[in-house]
Curated annotation (Swiss-Prot):
Magnesium among keywords: yes
Chief place where the protein resides: mitochondrion
Name the UniProt record assigns to this protein: Pyruvate dehydrogenase E1 component subunit alpha, mitochondrial
GO CC, one annotated term: mitochondrion
Chain residues that bind pyruvate: H111, Y137, R138, G184, V186, D215, G216, A217, N244, Y246
Coiled coil: none
Amino acid sequence: MFSRAVRLSRAALPIRVASQRVPIAARRSVTTNAAQAQVDKSTIPESEDEPFTIRLSDESFETYELDPPPYTLEVTKKQLKQMYYDMVVVRQMEMAADRLYKEKKIRGFCHLSVGQEAVAVGVEHAIEKTDDVITSYRCHGFAYMRGGTVRSIIGELLGRREGIAYGKGGSMHMFTKGFYGGNGIVGAQVPVGAGLAFAQKYTGGKKATVILYGDGASNQGQVFEAFNMAKLWNLPALFGCENNKYGMGTSAARSSALTDYYKRGQYIPGLKVNGMDVLAVKAAVQYGKQWTVEGNGPLVLEYVTYRYGGHSMSDPGTTYRTREEIQRMRSTNDPIAGLKQRIINWGVATEEEVKGIDKAARAHVNEEVAAAEAMAPPEPTAKILFEDIYVKGTEPRYIRGRTLDEVYYFN
């Protein structure tokens, strides 16, 4: 029922852009409440696949030099359940990674996204597999949503050859078709994403690139360079700042002169989104994709979200913020709890049915993690270092190593 392989296409329905710009005075501050969308329950069909219309909160968006997206969204029961399942899987996978790291089975850098699941899931449910996604080192959820398996992602974290990057990339460097990482250098993925968007425009078609980075990376010069080139060439690029309030241990207000990251493009329109509401994210990205593939050029989105854990596994996450702040966000703004509440209240599923989805997601993750843990460690041979570098048939005759006698010959 919840197979990633058989999920139906999520092409956006036509959205008409309003002709009148909304005065600044009419705009509201974006909330992080995950359960404010409403629906007329009498319009919800019996069929799992028949669409119905929900009304998003008036505090879902803020805009800059842009007409706001529609505050309505067409969904089906099946889509709502799938989004819920996906978020539970991503969270359980991240919690498994947390456990394995503390057991010293995962080493090195490891950045988890517990609390931020609505962004990865909402983005994927708004685009097509022919679109491209590139993000930062906090990438596990995106790797899964782009088509990776829990087994291959955990296997990668464990350094196994069956991992999504053959055990060579680790936490920060995961790749699959249409997903270009997972990038370890702060902000470095942004100009690469602009290049992907350039390729899409060059080859034609209604495709877009979703380019994600954090608030901590937003002050990087290369981000602004990418903005300039994307606007200059009118590229189909959806830049997106995942504003989780802290760049490592530094709050946004202490590091950025302008914390309205959606306005950072200056000459590029911007859209601020409630990143704790998976439905608001889906609606915003659907709107953004249609905007950009119609030839309007790039957009800068800001997803207002929150990470429950530290910046990385080496950060307890409580030296620069209070435990009370974290608990308040968990208890009042959790993206999974918010969607669960709406699914039950709207009669999309009963409480028992939702528990069944929870159970299925947890069982799937547990099975996949166990399979990853059972993978044999790779042989520590130098030969592995020279594999997966060149496309087969394009290799040079040899590669020299650190010393004159350390030479690897391709067969």
